């Protein structure tokens, strides 16, 4: 039988690094109760994104934390707030944007750690729960509002700004 596709190379995934003990905080949270059946959780990391200097940024959903790992592998807690950040991306102008399940579309001042709401609702309607985002080459921002939707409830949305 003809197969036009080449054999896929299997690559063994290995941990890049682990969260330092000083940032681990195993306890129940209002995020973990519905999403992890009430289990204690140390962290739930999402939204990896590199800035222009090569630092790796990501979010910790249950604790509302934004972290940066420097090019030297040093962890830094940039900010912590009362939200559930899920996705993080950098615009080509250097600004950081966050999709937050509870708070909507946010911006982050990477120097001060200040969080600002860009869009908390749309068309006078609350979001279901923002999840992730992507910047197109022309600068348009696409973001998903999925909440707890899925096959049984296919009402999630994609927005463009």
Residue map of PLM features:
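Sequence-structural signature of mature extracellular/luminal beta-sheet repeat domains
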Residues: 1-161
């Amino acid at each position: 039988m003809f197969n036009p596709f080449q054999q896929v190379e299997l690559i063994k995934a290995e941990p890049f690094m682990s969260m330092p003990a000083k940032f681990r905080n195993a306890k129940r949270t209002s995020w973990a109760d519905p999403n992890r059946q009430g289990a204690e959780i140390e962290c739930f990391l999402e939204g990896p994104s590199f800035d222009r200097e090569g630092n790796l940024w990501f979010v910790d959903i249950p604790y509302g934390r934004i972290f940066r790992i420097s090019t030297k592998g040093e962890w830094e807690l940039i900010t912590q707030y009362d939200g559930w950040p899920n996705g993080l991306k950098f615009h080509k102008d250097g600004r950081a944007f966050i999709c937050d399940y509870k708070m909507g579309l946010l911006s982050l001042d990477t120097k001060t750690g200040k969080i600002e709401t860009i869009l908390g609702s749309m068309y006078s309607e609350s979001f279901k729960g923002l999840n992730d985002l992507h910047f197109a080459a022309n600068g348009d921002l696409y973001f998903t509002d999925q909440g707890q939707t899925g096959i049984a409830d296919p009402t999630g949305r994609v927005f463009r700004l």
